[in-house]
């Protein structure tokens, strides 16, 4: 049994995702993580591995997560491939019937959404190519010479070069959308196209099943009368009212076909030469009637352009009162998580930013000159025979705050989840403590400098040093801070491993 999942369900899913982000009952977050990629793969930066989609790796994504940023309604858009118009480039034209046996002439695409049939001009206006100059002498179309710049509702040529292109204006990308969502490979489509007022003129001008283009792939032989024009030639099919004008040249061949009345309601159609009074001659011409998408051109921009991708805009930056995003260490993973929960709670996280790290407020004579190497290990003896181990994310010499993470590599497994027979620190991950037991201590030894201690006298989210207030990004209780998000909650729905960058 042969079956497919159509592109339309992909478009539907993209739209549903956008709606989900807009739903107040949901919380979507982007996240950054993984400061130690070389522990996973030595050549990570030159060849990042493809993320693995299993529960073991999902747990590791959580354990190596650094911080999260809320994705709001204005941070998500459906997008389509960005094809910038360039003089001399030949583009595919819109067709309703691309397939493996009827590929796009220019790109070779076997389906519409893989073809290069729409463009972005220099003014950030988007046009669909309804005719690319294709004719029996140029079956692959011709180079485009005139950049479309008009905003007329009806399709037309863009200039006087005679390149044969017919363009239809669809929409203009707003400056605010350009800044947030126009990328190297993708460009946004407008929100609320089906119901909004901003692009209503284009949408409301669409005619369901209205014919705009008839192409000529064979000019025929011995047609009609030389140098004649035949008007009101009917276009037959399951719609009604469409007509075209056929020009026959001096060789009694079809020179051009122009739609004079688009009609409506067509899902298939043919030109009826006989009913139009055009003698068919010895060889009938081959005329292809191009059927518009459902609703007509401009009715549903998502369906017409294949908007099954979503682009998320997430600006990863600190503010003075909530510095959750670390600096001085690298990140090599980004992702998206749906409905994570607050730490120690089943309540869905709603904060604009959240830290996924543990943190210690340290004190000691040399805290302002001590250093902790990024990704290095540090320990606390919590009690006799019990050691807490963390790996350094960063250390702030001004505030004495040490941020860290703990993953399975600290408890009997390597980074890829393989069990180790003799782990250095045992098989348990122990939390750092402001109240160590018998045989334990508050001492934390830095990479360089004098020994420091957990500052059990400090609780709060900010500290004052030399009459200046410093916000720490997360709340401390007796010198120890938990993450702000409950690890392993919600659904990680997107992961991207990438070459590491250092945040500064």
Where are these regions (language model features)?
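Feature for peripheral, non-core segments
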Residues: 1-126, 130-504
């Amino acid at each position: 049994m042969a079956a497919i999942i159509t592109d339309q369900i992909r478009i539907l899913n993209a739209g549903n995702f956008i709606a989900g982000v807009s739903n107040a009952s949901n919380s979507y977050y982007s996240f950054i993580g993984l400061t130690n990629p070389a522990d996973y793969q030595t050549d990570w930066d030159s060849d990042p591995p493809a993320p693995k989609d299993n529960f073991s790796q999902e747990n590791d994504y959580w354990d190596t997560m650094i911080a999260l940023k809320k994705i709001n309604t204005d941070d998500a858009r459906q997008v389509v491939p960005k094809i910038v118009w360039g003089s001399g480039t030949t583009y595919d034209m819109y067709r309703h019937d691309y397939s493996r046996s009827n590929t796009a002439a220019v790109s070779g695409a076997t389906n519409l959404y893989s073809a290069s049939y729409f463009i972005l001009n220099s003014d950030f206006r988007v046009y669909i190519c309804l005719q690319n100059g294709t004719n029996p002498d140029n079956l692959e179309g011709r180079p485009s010479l005139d950049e479309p710049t008009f905003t007329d509702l009806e399709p037309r040529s863009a200039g006087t070069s005679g390149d044969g292109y017919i363009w239809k204006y669809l929409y203009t990308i707003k400056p605010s959308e350009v800044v947030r969502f126009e990328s190297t490979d993708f460009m946004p489509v407008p929100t609320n196209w089906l119901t909004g007022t901003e692009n209503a003129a284009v949408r409301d001008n669409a005619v369901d099943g209205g014919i705009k283009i008839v192409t000529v792939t064979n000019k025929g032989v011995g047609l009609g009368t030389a140098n004649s024009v035949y008007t009101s030639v009917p276009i037959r099919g399951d719609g009604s009212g469409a007509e075209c004008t056929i020009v026959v040249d001096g060789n009694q061949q079809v020179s051009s076909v122009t739609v004079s009345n688009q009609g409506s309601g067509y899902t298939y159609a043919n030109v009826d030469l006989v009913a139009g009074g055009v003698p068919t001659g010895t060889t009938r011409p081959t005329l292809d009637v191009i059927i518009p998408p459902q609703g007509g051109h401009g009715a549903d921009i998502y369906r017409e352009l294949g908007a099954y991708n979503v682009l998320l805009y997430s600006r990863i930056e600190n503010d003075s009162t909530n510095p959750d995003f670390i600096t001085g260490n690298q990140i090599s993973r980004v992702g998206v998580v749906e409905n994570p929960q607050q730490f120690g709670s089943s309540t869905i996280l709603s904060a604009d930013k959240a830290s996924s790290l543990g943190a210690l407020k340290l004190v000691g004579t040399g805290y302002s000159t001590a250093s902790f190497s990024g990704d290095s290990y540090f320990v606390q003896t919590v009690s006799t025979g019990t050691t807490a181990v963390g790996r350094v994310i960063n250390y702030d010499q001004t505030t004495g705050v040490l941020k860290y993470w703990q993953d399975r590599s600290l408890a009997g497994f390597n980074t890829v989840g393989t069990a180790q027979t003799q782990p250095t620190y045992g098989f348990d991950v122990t939390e750092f403590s402001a109240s160590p037991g018998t045989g334990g201590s508050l001492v934390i030894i830095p990479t360089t400098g004098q020994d420091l201690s957990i500052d059990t006298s400090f609780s709060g989210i900010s500290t004052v040093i030399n009459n200046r207030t410093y916000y720490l990004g997360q709340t401390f209780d007796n010198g120890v801070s938990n993450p702000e998000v409950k690890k392993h909650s919600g659904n990680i729905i997107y992961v991207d491993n990438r070459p590491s960058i250092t945040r500064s």
